[in-house]
Amino acid sequence: MDFSSNIASQLNAGTILPEGIVIITLMVVLIGDLIGGRNARMWLPYGAIAGLLAALFALYTAWDNPSTIGFLGAFNGDNLSIVFRGIIALSTIVTLLMSIRYVEQTGTSLAEFIGIMLTATLGGMFLSGANELVMIFISLEMLSISSYLMTGYMKRDPRSNEAALKYLLIGASSSAIFLYGSSLLYGLSGGETTLDTISAKILASDGSSSLGLAIALVFVIAGIAFKISAVPFHQWTPDVYEGSPTPVVAFLSVGSKAAGFALAIRLLVTAFSSIVDEWHLIFTALAILSMVLGNVVALAQTSMKRMLAYSSIGQAGFVMIGLTAGTDAGYSSMVFYLLVYLFMNLGAFSGVILFSLRTGTDQISEYAGLYQKDPLLTLGLSLCLLSLGGIPPLAGFFGKIYLFWAGWQAELYGLVLLALVTSVVSIYYYIRVVKMMVVKEPHEMSDSVKNYPEIRWNLEGMRPLQVGLVLSVIATSLAGILSNPLFSLANDSVTSTPILQSTIVNTRISQGEIPSSTIDP
């Protein structure tokens, strides 16, 4: 009895209850597809959404749980991981809403698509709390392989096949690079795999000044930068976004990116705590390159999906300001921005899907005069694009204000000024699309808008897509007007996470803000 109680306490399986619910949901979807008839299969996406909502409720009940370590230290269910797991689950819910009509119209299996997406969600959720090298790599591969499959899901579309092949080849290379960096950490720590123990062993052996740790840092950051589409590891992003099914692109731009930032925070803050200044410097360079290239190249794009691809690269640069600041405000603003980015970006992709389903194109020029034929779509897409640009009083404005303020407080003056300039550049290409939809006269309508089909929301799968768009627009608007609760949530997730607090204190000591004598031994 004592032995079993000891094992149960060390496993602490309750920390992965949300993931357990998603696993059960995945099994129900697959079994329902096998044994259910056509009518039963119609309800599978809604069953998947219900399971994800149950997982979100389980995450809510786990908030401020005093026992967060599970599976012998391999998983940490702290408040920070809860927020990131919630972002990934929410992004999957909205993506499923926009996928039903899109996937059915292509003639492929919706249940298989949902199963792959739930597997990717599981990988992202596990990655957000992974605290051990093996757990990190398995979770990363679960997310990556599922993403490759979703990218090439439209087997009859040559562009989808090309995107999947590019994503697979570059993704496999980045995984190998990340794995090599992780193996160096394993060797430098004397064969340890838990992140806390790795950090302690490296500090005890005075390995913080070793060349091996510097090489490990470079390789690990290269792997993470691929996942978050940071320049110069962004080459796959425009082609994959343009060729992949649009719902998949929406998930990659939010869920996959959130998982990448969760990994960046936990791995770098814990395992590389002895060389914080070095990885801050690297991320400063990545942020500069991402903001400049992402926003400048987006100006020249003619495809909506390709423009949003470069936009997501620029947005990743903005988020990296919070990571580089390394303060309470920096991490909090980073989490807050990802929370609001979830809704404004998925709302924009919902609009792109609606337009492409009705016209068969995603060319920006074809949106000319859309307001005359579809005011709801024009309003929703315009609000989401303006929020991405940071126009007040929408959510994106407050997200950028918090990020820039955190960077300024951390004395990253040059980085913040560059972010302001590139943010203004981004406003231009977002407003260009809005202007094209709203301002154009009837005789200036594009051919696609002139031949715009009658709006019929009663078609199968169209109502969920409408719900996804409306929810995203409402959340984007309300998150801007009522941003304080969301920022309090982000701030609580940071201040209640011990690994972040210890790193923040060490950073302030190294900068001379706190004398080391004031810290208890």
Swiss-Prot record:
<feature type="transmembrane region" description="Helical">
    <location>
        <begin position="279"/>
        <end position="299"/>
    </location>
</feature>
<feature type="transmembrane region" description="Helical">
    <location>
        <begin position="133"/>
        <end position="153"/>
    </location>
</feature>
<protein>
    <recommendedName>
        <fullName>NAD(P)H-quinone oxidoreductase subunit 2</fullName>
        <ecNumber>7.1.1.-</ecNumber>
    </recommendedName>
</protein>
<comment type="function">
    <text>NDH-1 shuttles electrons from an unknown electron donor, via FMN and iron-sulfur (Fe-S) centers, to quinones in the respiratory and/or the photosynthetic chain. The immediate electron acceptor for the enzyme in this species is believed to be plastoquinone. Couples the redox reaction to proton translocation, and thus conserves the redox energy in a proton gradient. Cyanobacterial NDH-1 also plays a role in inorganic carbon-concentration.</text>
</comment>
<dbReference type="GO" id="GO:0042773">
    <property type="term" value="P:ATP synthesis coupled electron transport"/>
</dbReference>
<keyword id="KW-0618">Plastoquinone</keyword>
<feature type="transmembrane region" description="Helical">
    <location>
        <begin position="16"/>
        <end position="36"/>
    </location>
</feature>
<dbReference type="Pfam" id="PF19530">
    <property type="entry name" value="Ndh2_N"/>
</dbReference>
<keyword id="KW-0793">Thylakoid</keyword>
<keyword id="KW-1133">Transmembrane helix</keyword>
<feature type="transmembrane region" description="Helical">
    <location>
        <begin position="211"/>
        <end position="231"/>
    </location>
</feature>
<keyword id="KW-1278">Translocase</keyword>
<keyword id="KW-0521">NADP</keyword>
<dbReference type="InterPro" id="IPR001750">
    <property type="entry name" value="ND/Mrp_TM"/>
</dbReference>
<dbReference type="Pfam" id="PF00361">
    <property type="entry name" value="Proton_antipo_M"/>
</dbReference>
<keyword id="KW-0874">Quinone</keyword>
<feature type="transmembrane region" description="Helical">
    <location>
        <begin position="335"/>
        <end position="355"/>
    </location>
</feature>
<feature type="transmembrane region" description="Helical">
    <location>
        <begin position="245"/>
        <end position="265"/>
    </location>
</feature>
<keyword id="KW-0472">Membrane</keyword>
<feature type="transmembrane region" description="Helical">
    <location>
        <begin position="80"/>
        <end position="100"/>
    </location>
</feature>
<feature type="transmembrane region" description="Helical">
    <location>
        <begin position="307"/>
        <end position="327"/>
    </location>
</feature>
<dbReference type="InterPro" id="IPR045693">
    <property type="entry name" value="Ndh2_N"/>
</dbReference>
<keyword id="KW-0520">NAD</keyword>
<dbReference type="InterPro" id="IPR010096">
    <property type="entry name" value="NADH-Q_OxRdtase_suN/2"/>
</dbReference>
<feature type="transmembrane region" description="Helical">
    <location>
        <begin position="110"/>
        <end position="130"/>
    </location>
</feature>
<feature type="transmembrane region" description="Helical">
    <location>
        <begin position="43"/>
        <end position="63"/>
    </location>
</feature>
<keyword id="KW-0812">Transmembrane</keyword>
<dbReference type="GO" id="GO:0048038">
    <property type="term" value="F:quinone binding"/>
</dbReference>
<feature type="transmembrane region" description="Helical">
    <location>
        <begin position="168"/>
        <end position="188"/>
    </location>
</feature>
<comment type="similarity">
    <text>Belongs to the complex I subunit 2 family.</text>
</comment>
<dbReference type="GO" id="GO:0008137">
    <property type="term" value="F:NADH dehydrogenase (ubiquinone) activity"/>
</dbReference>
<keyword id="KW-0813">Transport</keyword>
<feature type="transmembrane region" description="Helical">
    <location>
        <begin position="467"/>
        <end position="487"/>
    </location>
</feature>
<dbReference type="GO" id="GO:0019684">
    <property type="term" value="P:photosynthesis, light reaction"/>
</dbReference>
<feature type="transmembrane region" description="Helical">
    <location>
        <begin position="401"/>
        <end position="421"/>
    </location>
</feature>
<comment type="subunit">
    <text>NDH-1 can be composed of about 15 different subunits; different subcomplexes with different compositions have been identified which probably have different functions.</text>
</comment>
<feature type="transmembrane region" description="Helical">
    <location>
        <begin position="379"/>
        <end position="399"/>
    </location>
</feature>
<dbReference type="GO" id="GO:0031676">
    <property type="term" value="C:plasma membrane-derived thylakoid membrane"/>
</dbReference>
